[in-house]
């Protein structure tokens, strides 16, 4: 009998792959990228869209502020699309393609650059006098030297879970179908939850990009609210009434330019 794995975080990762894996795979396939890259956000964030490193890297794909902005992600007081699984995955695909092309299709070097920045990788290549990752590796930062082998190991573990003795401690929840509604008015999470008859926690879980439990209005085209497909009809029907509920608690939203100071570090890459 296979052992039941209960170590901290594994069930959450397995659940995350079950719930988000298809979305990531679809994006990778659409961008003609290796499907094994779906395990990269497992290594980066444990598939937690709210993950934030001590250096400020944020979201599933752990984008720094400068990299996120270079990939056209919205980052302001109300919205941080680095935390949006769909938007950040599209940005990650664009970024990974750029790194792949930069290193002539060598994924070992491209992934090292994803972790350490192309500046650090190019410096290591010059010092090694080679573009063979395994020769370049000893000139890379310690974390990056371990990063690519760790991803290779992770791919094997999750592609061959029986061989590795990995099984979840409880059955995984089935994937559920999601839909998106574009909102042009300010809608609080509690109002959205009231309209669709779902808990606020579900709204928050499906919409991690909003920083203040509010979908902000005032933008051409509106901002997306992600919800389960079976909740769309009830939500649209009940939304007008829900917007009147405790309307005085809904804050005014403005998108004035923010001043952000970022200190450039050796090896940083803009995108």
Regions found by a protein language model. Give the residues of each.
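Extracytoplasmic and endomembrane cell-envelope/extracellular-matrix remodeling and assembly machinery
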Residues: 1-26, 30-31, 70, 75-78, ...
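A structure-centric signal for secondary-structure junctions around beta-strands
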Residues: 37, 57-58, 148, 222
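Short, surface-exposed glycine/acidic/tryptophan-bearing loops
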Residues: 50-72
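Alpha-helical scaffolds flanking conserved acidic
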Residues: 34-41, 58, 106-112
């Amino acid at each position: 009998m296979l052992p039941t794995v209960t170590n901290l975080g594994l069930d959450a990762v397995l659940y995350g792959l079950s719930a988000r894996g298809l979305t990531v795979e679809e994006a990778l396939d659409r961008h003609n990228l290796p499907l094994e890259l779906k395990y990269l956000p497992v290594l980066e964030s444990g598939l937690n869209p709210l993950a934030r490193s001590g250096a400020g890297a944020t979201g599933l794909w752990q984008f720094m502020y400068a990299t996120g902005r270079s990939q056209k992600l919205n980052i302001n007081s109300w919205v941080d699309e680095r935390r949006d699984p769909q938007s950040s995955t599209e940005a990650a695909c664009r970024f990974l393609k750029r790194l792949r092309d930069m290193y002539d299709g060598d994924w070992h070097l491209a992934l090292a650059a994803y972790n350490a920045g192309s500046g650090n990788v190019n410096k290591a290549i010059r010092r090694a006098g080679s573009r063979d990752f395994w020769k370049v590796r000893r000139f890379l930062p310690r974390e990056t030297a371990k990063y690519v082998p760790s991803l290779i190991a992770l791919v094997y573990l999750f592609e061959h879970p029986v061989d590795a003795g990995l099984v979840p401690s409880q059955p995984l929840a089935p994937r559920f179908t999601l839909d998106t509604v574009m909102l042009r008015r300010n809608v609080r999470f509690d109002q959205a939850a009231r309209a669709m008859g779902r808990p606020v926690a579900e709204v928050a879980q499906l919409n991690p990009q909003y920083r203040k439990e509010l979908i902000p209005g005032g933008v051409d085209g509106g901002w997306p609210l992600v919800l389960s497909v079976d909740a769309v009809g009830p939500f649209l029907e009940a939304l007008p009434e829900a917007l009147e509920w405790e309307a005085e608690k809904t804050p005014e939203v403005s998108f004035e330019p923010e001043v952000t100071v970022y200190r450039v570090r050796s090896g940083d890459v803009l995108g």
